[in-house]
């Protein structure tokens, strides 16, 4: 799996686990809906660490907790 796909799946998983929507997450973390939609739809090919950090703030988790998922275990280089 590529990194961008792992990030996309992790965001969707965290939203589902917290019973929130991607739209609500935009409000919580201050990311534009178009940016988050591009990430979660797979159109964005280069999500920055700064964006992931903002998502973590909105999700109330640490950056290491975001990456603590089997999605990131066997990434393609």
Language-model region placement:
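Short, basic-rich loop-to-helix N-cap that marks the start of a DNA-contacting helix
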Residues: 43-57
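A short, Lys/Arg-rich alpha-helix, primarily the initiator
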Residues: 1-21
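The alpha-helix within a helix-turn-helix
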Residues: 15, 26, 56
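Conserved hydrophobic/aromatic packing and binding residues within compact polymer-binding modules
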Residues: 11, 25, 36-39, 66
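Recognition helix of helix-turn-helix/homeodomain-like DNA-binding domains
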Residues: 31-46
